[in-house]
């Protein structure tokens, strides 16, 4: 570096630039040092060397500050990785199929419950079933005793048929399956046939008075 013709002008210009780049405390120390340096103007090389050292310190401070700014400006790679993992997990959950255990449980249901379960999904087509009518006690027997009816008919239809044959009101007809229990009028004959048939026949016992219970 070629020393300038006037050490005093170089010191003044460098002093003002360096002082603006420093904090207040550093600026006071710097001004004190410059004041001491002015007392040594006879040694121009010393003054020039001191100013160069001061400038190098300022440059070093700026480099440190720039490095800190760069660190804070870097993207958070961990957060982006976590977000990507969350998206992958949600996609995996959405594609999960029904567990195999569920189908195993359905297959192991009792036979009657399996048929009922299949009917709720797709009702079975109506078929012809055999009904045998057996009178109880002194109730008059009707003919025919064996009927072929549709499986989607209800017990109420059969009660009206018996009432017509006996020439009594429907309220006076009491019907039982195998002399055991009395079905409700809205029950389907096909369902009762599937559960209580004997020798491919559903046996109904009937009378015009209460027989049981």
Swiss-Prot record:
GO terms for biological process: autophagosome assembly; autophagosome maturation; autophagy of mitochondrion; glycophagy; piecemeal microautophagy of the nucleus; protein transport. InterPro entries: Atg12, Ubiquitin-like_domsf. Keywords: Autophagy, Isopeptide bond, Membrane, Protein transport, Transport, Ubl conjugation pathway. It is found in: Preautophagosomal structure membrane. It is a peripheral membrane protein. The keyword Membrane applies. Ubiquitin-like protein involved in cytoplasm to vacuole transport (Cvt), autophagy vesicles formation, mitophagy, and nucleophagy. Conjugation with ATG5 through a ubiquitin-like conjugating system involving also ATG7 as an E1-like activating enzyme and ATG10 as an E2-like conjugating enzyme, is essential for its function. The ATG12-ATG5 conjugate functions as an E3-like enzyme which is required for lipidation of ATG8 and ATG8 association to the vesicle membranes. Forms a conjugate with ATG5. This is Ubiquitin-like protein ATG12. The lineage of its organism: Eukaryota, Fungi, Dikarya, Ascomycota, Saccharomycotina.
């Amino acid at each position: 570096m070629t020393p300038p013709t006037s050490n005093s002008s170089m010191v003044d210009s460098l002093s003002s630039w360096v002082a603006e780049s420093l904090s207040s405390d550093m600026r006071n120390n710097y001004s004190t040092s410059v004041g001491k340096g002015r007392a040594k103007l006879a040694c121009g090389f010393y003054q020039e060397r001191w100013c160069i050292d001061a400038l190098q310190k300022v440059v070093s401070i700026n480099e440190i500050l720039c490095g800190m700014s760069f660190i804070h400006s870097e993207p958070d790679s961990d957060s982006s990785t976590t977000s990507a993992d969350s998206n992958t997990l949600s996609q995996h959950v959405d594609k999960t199929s029904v567990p195999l255990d569920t189908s195993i449980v359905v297959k192991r249901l009792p036979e009657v419950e399996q048929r009922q379960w299949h009917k709720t999904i797709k009702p079975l087509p109506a078929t012809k079933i055999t009904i045998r009518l057996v009178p109880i006690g002194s109730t008059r027997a009707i003919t025919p005793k064996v009927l072929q009816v549709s499986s989607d008919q209800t017990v109420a239809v059969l009660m009206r048929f018996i009432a017509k044959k006996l020439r009594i009101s429907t309220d006076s007809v009491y019907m039982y399956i195998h002399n055991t229990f009395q079905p409700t009028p809205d029950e389907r004959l096909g369902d009762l046939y599937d559960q209580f048939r004997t020798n491919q026949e559903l046996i109904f016992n009937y009378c015009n008075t209460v027989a049981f219970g």
